[in-house]
């Protein structure tokens, strides 16, 4: 495994760790998700280029489109939640509360 692959996997692992540890605010969770998607995009692109697998050359672009849609929906939810509750704490989103 090359140094580039290890750095990308380390970036993915750090984003996943950040998502698991700092999940009290919605904004930090969205940033960690974007870091995970970006590292997956780079890893997928490098893997396809190294293996000369031309049939799957559109797969990273499709992943990037889904990441952009996820970011747009996440930011729309963040704005709506911030306007409704006045904060972006995830604990306020529990549907079981009165």
UniProtKB/Swiss-Prot annotation:
InterPro entries associated with the record? NADH_UbQ_OxRdtase_chain4L/K (IPR001133), NUOK/Mnh_C1-like (IPR039428)
Top-level taxon: Eukaryota
- Give the main EC class: translocase
Q: Name one Pfam family in it.
A: Oxidored_q2
* Keyword Transferase applies: no
One GO term (biological process):
ATP synthesis coupled electron transport
Q: Listed GO cellular component terms? A: mitochondrial inner membrane; respiratory chain complex I
What are its E.C. numbers?
7.1.1.2
Q: Which GO terms describe its molecular function?
A: NADH dehydrogenase (ubiquinone) activity
Q: Does the keyword Transmembrane apply?
A: yes
Q: How does it sit in the membrane?
A: Multi-pass membrane protein
Could you list this entry's UniProt keywords, alphabetically sorted. Electron transport, Membrane, Mitochondrion, Mitochondrion inner membrane, NAD, Respiratory chain, Translocase, Transmembrane, Transmembrane helix, Transport, Ubiquinone
Give me the segments passing through the membrane: 1-21, 29-49, 59-79
Name its cellular compartments. Mitochondrion inner membrane
**Major localization class:** mitochondrion
Catalytic activity line of the entry: a ubiquinone + NADH + 5 H(+)(in) = a ubiquinol + NAD(+) + 4 H(+)(out)
Q: Which PANTHER family match?
A: NADH-UBIQUINONE OXIDOREDUCTASE CHAIN 4L, NADH-UBIQUINONE OXIDOREDUCTASE SUBUNIT ND4L
| Family per similarity comment | Belongs to the complex I subunit 4L family.
Indicate the quaternary assembly.
Answer: Core subunit of respiratory chain NADH dehydrogenase (Complex I) which is composed of 45 different subunits.
Q: Any idea what job this protein has? A: Core subunit of the mitochondrial membrane respiratory chain NADH dehydrogenase (Complex I) which catalyzes electron transfer from NADH through the respiratory chain, using ubiquinone as an electron acceptor. Part of the enzyme membrane arm which is embedded in the lipid bilayer and involved in proton translocation.
Its recorded name reads: NADH-ubiquinone oxidoreductase chain 4L
């Amino acid at each position: 495994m090359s140094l580039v692959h290890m750095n990308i996997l380390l970036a993915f692992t750090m984003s996943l760790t950040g998502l698991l540890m700092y999940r009290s605010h919605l904004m930090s969770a969205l940033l960690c998700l974007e870091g995970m998607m970006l590292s997956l995009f780079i890893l997928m692109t490098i893997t396809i280029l190294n293996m000369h697998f031309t049939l799957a050359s559109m797969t990273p672009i499709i992943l990037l489109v889904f990441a952009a849609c996820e970011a747009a929906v996440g930011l729309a939810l963040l704005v709506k939640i911030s306007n409704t509750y006045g904060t972006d704490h995830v604990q306020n989103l529990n549907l079981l509360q009165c």
